[in-house]
UniProtKB/Swiss-Prot annotation:
Its main location: membrane. NDH-1 is composed of 14 different subunits. Subunits NuoA, H, J, K, L, M, N constitute the membrane sector of the complex. This is NADH-quinone oxidoreductase subunit H. NCBIfam families: PRK06076.1-2. PANTHER family: NADH DEHYDROGENASE SUBUNIT 1, NADH-UBIQUINONE OXIDOREDUCTASE CHAIN 1. It comes from Helicobacter hepaticus (strain ATCC 51449 / 3B1). The chain crosses the membrane at residues 8-28, 44-66, 78-98, 120-140, 157-177, 196-216, 245-265, 274-294, 312-332. GO terms for molecular function: NADH dehydrogenase activity; oxidoreductase activity, acting on NAD(P)H, quinone or similar compound as acceptor; quinone binding. It catalyses: a quinone + NADH + 5 H(+)(in) = a quinol + NAD(+) + 4 H(+)(out). GO terms for cellular component: plasma membrane. Keywords: Cell inner membrane, Cell membrane, Membrane, NAD, Quinone, Translocase, Transmembrane, Transmembrane helix, Ubiquinone. The gene is nuoH.
């Protein structure tokens, strides 16, 4: 077998593994979130289907597959069908340059847990993730429903505004590292905990994690589908597998964002004291996933005007100031 053929087979196997694992994690994420929310609200959460309610995910999946797939009469059919696919596809493509774990060896063969090691990895993630805006936007425009249309309009405003904050918040750490490769970013922090960028760029971390909440459409920033105002927003007319693809895309993005936060700001998969690197990054990712769910249980919704005011009048000046200060420190 030639080296090229072996590389192609290895890449295909990695893609299949990532698709299977993160699709399963998306389903398990719903169970975990319901358990966490139940804990904060002094409830038990899912506990009837299987031991500790673990088979609730399977029951939900069966229900989802069994639901009738309905397309509204006034919908623009091709775009209506395309929108959920964009949500899921962009979420998984964005994972290509993410190094999930350190290298390990199986039967003498060195495995690198990354699909594509490109030197502009973080730029690729941002570019592909930003294409995900087309999913709620097209869904809202094509559904023929006023609530969906308002949800799609909010998606365009919300995502485009916070793309600016996301990029500017990452600009300062990238100026320090002088590389766009996620592996280089990870290797930069391989010393002690004081080398983690969360301590060198705390403002950038705060801005990035808030922007991540907004772009993931998580509470308290889920203005695209706020139940009290828009029923289900852009997804009002979706059911069955099409709705499921939106949900898979959202949770896959959430896990990918947790990996990005761990890699860029929290030391990545470097050894953490006596804890091996692979276990260390899993602990960090689990912490950020729990944090996403904790915030949902804690904070009330914000209004769209409050969100835009926070973006343009507070976060944008802070992000620009952080870039300016970092540039001056590096220059002088």
């Amino acid at each position: 077998m030639s080296e090229l053929t072996g590389g192609i087979i290895e890449c295909i196997l990695k893609i299949i593994v990532v698709l299977l694992i993160f699709s399963a994690l998306a389903g398990f994420g719903t169970y975990l979130e319901r358990k966490v929310l139940g804990f904060f609200q002094r409830r038990i959460g899912p506990n009837y289907v299987g031991p500790y309610g673990l088979l609730q995910v399977v029951a939900d999946g069966i229900k989802l597959f069994a639901k009738e797939d309905i397309i509204p009469q006034n919908a623009i059919k091709p775009i209506f069908i395309l929108a959920p696919s964009i949500a899921a596809i962009t979420a998984f493509i964005a994972m290509a340059p993410i190094p999930f774990f350190p290298e390990f060896e199986i039967f003498g063969y060195v495995v690198r847990p990354i699909i594509a090691d490109i030197n502009v990895g973080i730029l690729f993630v941002l570019a592909v993730s930003s294409c995900g805006i087309y999913a709620p936007l097209l869904a809202g425009l094509s559904s023929g429903n006023k609530w969906s249309l308002i949800g799609g309009a909010r998606a365009a405003i919300q995502f485009l505004s916070f793309e600016v904050i996301t990029i500017l918040s990452l600009l300062a750490p990238l100026m320090i590292i002088e590389s766009l490769s996620l592996i280089d970013i990870n290797n930069y922090q391989q010393g002690s905990m004081l080398d983690w960028l969360i301590f060198k760029q705390p403002l950038a971390f705060g801005l990035f994690i808030i922007a991540a909440y907004v772009e993931l459409n998580r509470t308290p920033f889920d203005l695209l589908e706020h139940e009290a105002e828009l029923t289900a927003g852009f997804a009002t007319e979706y059911s069955g597998l099409k709705w499921g693809m939106f949900f898979i895309g959202e949770y896959a993005n959430m896990f990918a964002t947790a990996f990005i936060l761990s890699l860029v700001f929290c030391g990545g998969f470097n050894d953490w004291g006596f804890i091996p690197g692979g276990i260390a990054i899993l602990l960090k990712v689990c912490f950020f996933i729990f944090l996403f769910m904790w915030v949902r249980a804690t904070f009330p919704h914000v209004r769209p005007d409050q969100l835009m005011r926070m973006c343009w009048k507070i976060m944008l000046p802070l992000a620009l100031l952080n870039v300016l200060i970092t540039g001056c420190i590096l220059l002088f």
